[in-house]
Structure formats: structure tokens, C-alpha cells
Amino acid sequence: MFKELYQYRELLKTSIKKEIRGKYKASALGVAWSFINPLLQVLVYAIVFPYILGNRVDNYIVYLVSGIIPWTFFQTTLNQSVSCIRNNYGIIKKVYFPRVILPISVVCSGLVNFMISCIIILLFSLIWGVGISWHIIFVPLIALIEGMFALGVGMALGAADAYFQDLEYFVMFLLQLLF
């Protein structure tokens, strides 16, 4: 598999670029959505939990951002990985290439988006005076591990999704429930 991926590395690079560019292509705000989406989620949770439900946690906003951004990365890449084989069925039927390129490109583009979103975590940590630990050097490694986990689960569920197309919606619901 790795030898074949190496042989098709240009296709993999092109597919990753297509995923990154295609995500915000028709959007007026473009890549800014990498910042806006998590900020809007944080805003909703920051209002609902501490003020309406009475949940009080020190540095709650930083706590919230530190959880929402990695979870959103996992949720998005897993959802897209589950359906990417079925969504590209027309191409798969016509041209041979390693099918694993499709979910790998989804996860890699998600990693790029996640690393951009990590800037929000840094900013919130500095603004709220939490500070930044030297442990931050492990974020890329942890993101890579999280991405590999999403890739593995996404590939397994993607194979099943080819036969049970409702699985995609069940996975979306389950991931929302788990958060």
C-alpha cells in the first residue's frame, strides 16, 4: 500500500490541495471560516452553559475552545471520510488509483484546517491569561494521531457506507451525541 501511495504521490498532493481549496471556494469569507465556525460554536456554548445552566468553570472559554476545536476536527474528518468513497464513485469506476487516497486527502486537509484553528486556542489562552506550556510542542503529534484514528475509523465505516448509505447520517448523529 505504501509503495502504491508513493507512486501516486502527485495525485495525493493534488487531491489534498483540491480538498483545501474546494472547501471554501464558493464562500465569500473563504479560509476565514476556519476561524469563524469555531468562534460561533464557542459563543453558543459560552452563553448556554455558564449563564443558562449555571455551570461555572475557571477559564471556561479556554477550556471550551481547547475541546471544541479538536473535536470539530475529528468530527468533520470522520464524517467526510465515511462518505468520500461513495461521493467519488464516478471517478473510482473510470480510473484506477489507490482508493485510500480519498480519505487520506480528507484527513490531511482537515489537519491543515485544524492547525489554522489552533491559533484560536493560542489567542484565547493568552487573552485569558492561562499561558502557554511547553507541552504545546506535542500538538502536531497528537493531531496526527487523532487524524490517523479518524482515517482508520472513516475507512472502515466508508467501506460499510458503500453498502448502507444511511450509515453516513447515523455517524453524523452519533458524533453530535458524543459531544
Language-model segments: residues:
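Hydrophobic transmembrane alpha-helices and immediately adjacent juxtamembrane helices
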Residues: 1-179
